[in-house]
Amino acid sequence: ANLNGSAYSSAAVNIDMLGLGKLNINQGDSGNGIDAFDDKMPTAWEEPWGAAVGTGVKLVSGSGPNSNVMYTSPTMAGATITFTIAPDMGSADVADNGYSGHGGSTGKGQDLTLNINPTLGTEILSGLNLFVGAHQTANTVSTENNLYEGVGGLTFDLGPVSLGYAASGVSTGQEAMSEVDW
């Protein structure tokens, strides 16, 4: 990956450590951390972004679209935990023969997620899925606070019927009165 003028490849490497979990080394092709939970709701493709139409809707993304490393725990009692760290938020989605440049005023980012399928040995709960995730990006400028993102929700599948509820939020860390804090 270092043969392209000291630029990184837009690659992902998955390492399965058997009973110890999984490790994913990712150069920003998204899907890691809370980015995996940005929209877990049941869909009939009614969302505009489901048809590749731009909406301006701010979904949580966390460390996912940045160069990152994610550890996924083995599933125990229906629960899976992931921890994702991005050493420099803003260095992301890099194509071959390209580079992302400086990450700006942001430092490292980290995500923690928990996904639970609490079947408890019953057939009726086999379709229940609970999820929660949080992200924090460290700002390196003294006039800005850290950025925080969070998401949580549940889905329930029973036969062909799928129901869900989720909520997410973003605190940008911006100090100026005219800046939007989602």
Protein language model annotation of sequence segments:
Residues A1-W182:
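Outer-membrane beta-barrel proteins
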